[in-house]
Amino acid sequence: MTIASSTASSEFLKNPYSFYDTLRAVHPIYKGSFLKYPGWYVTGYEETAAILKDARFKVRTPLPESSTKYQDLSHVQNQMMLFQNQPDHRRLRTLASGAFTPRTTESYQPYIIETVHHLLDQVQGKKKMEVISDFAFPLASFVIANIIGVPEEDREQLKEWAASLIQTIDFTRSRKALTEGNIMAVQAMAYFKELIQKRKRHPQQDMISMLLKGREKDKLTEEEAASTCILLAIAGHETTVNLISNSVLCLLQHPEQLLKLRENPDLIGTAVEECLRYESPTQMTARVASEDIDICGVTIRQGEQVYLLLGAANRDPSIFTNPDVFDITRSPNPHLSFGHGHHVCLGSSLARLEAQIAINTLLQRMPSLNLADFEWRYRPLFGFRALEELPVTFE
């Protein structure tokens, strides 16, 4: 059975959840095709969690290994831990994890607070702002660039690479996006290789220098180090930007929940978790079966692709009471927005911290925050929940 490509319309982008419900009603593991991508589409929570934990389901790069047209892009993707299986994934993750331990993440808090206030200072007197370009994107950019070790004068370039390369891993990628991504991959790889050479000569307190310390011991190649930086730049931008902007929209669309958070800012932790569940920044992740696997009443054959719809799993009524209700006091809230198992998001604690500080500070400094008279739209991406822009007003 084929899923009609018309579901990639603006209606689907605005609200994919009714589509997810339709699939789940047929079977939580549904065999079909979407935008010419055949495979198993998983909408059930238990099924999604089970597959994410099962090492027999492997990751692979979005571009076929035999692809020759976009060789540079394919080469960069092949070096990223996101598309590595064990033991290489564990090796790369261990090397990068030092920048994202709970203690290290907590140490970023003063810089995040300072940056949030600086960005809000720029718009406070204008009585309006565009949440993404004025606030969420520059915040995410400053923070991840600071962690990686990218100089301030190069951060605009980092944003451009991240915006281009994210499109190359989505279902909706076009030849134009892949061609541009191939060019950006060359530029980003060359840039980070040069920066790595500088850090070899002059180490600093950043992630590049940290990766170089562990390079010889764990046989980290220069290209793996550069690709790790590129991956974290992409993830550090997209996840955080989408989390903050989606959260602001959710709260403004649900004034009773917004009032609850204003009256009790200590609810920010559960509020961010509910925003993650309700509008997951990452809507889909993929795996491929390494052998014939019987799971949840179906047999997935070796080589078949499995698409895990995280946004659907987060609204599975067998796990979440009233799943379509936005409730910032929801607890427990075991959403899968950051994944599950070995590939759980490395920077999840950082994204949470940025969102909590950004949202609470925004609400405190702009107590009359409202949505502008504007028809907001989502970027044409299937795997990510990403607003194009979000204008707001305030007194």
Curated annotation (Swiss-Prot):
This is Biotin biosynthesis cytochrome P450. Belongs to the cytochrome P450 family. It catalyses: a C2-C8-saturated long-chain fatty acyl-[ACP] + 2 reduced [flavodoxin] + 3 O2 = 6-carboxyhexanoyl-[ACP] + a fatty aldehyde + 2 oxidized [flavodoxin] + 3 H2O + 3 H(+). Heme binds at H89, R90, R91, L92, R93, T285, A286, R287, H343, V344, C345. It comes from the Bacteria. Pathway: Cofactor biosynthesis; biotin biosynthesis. CDD domains: CYP164-like. Catalyzes the C-C bond cleavage of fatty acid linked to acyl carrier protein (ACP) to generate pimelic acid for biotin biosynthesis. It has high affinity for long-chain fatty acids with the greatest affinity for myristic acid. Keywords: Biotin biosynthesis, Disulfide bond, Heme, Iron, Metal-binding, Monooxygenase, Oxidoreductase. The gene is bioI. Its cofactor is heme. Binds 1 heme group covalently per subunit. Substrate binds at R60, I169, D170, F171, T172, R173, Y307. GO terms for molecular function: heme binding; iron ion binding; monooxygenase activity; oxidoreductase activity, acting on paired donors, with incorporation or reduction of molecular oxygen. One of its GO terms (biological process) is biotin biosynthetic process. The keyword Iron applies.
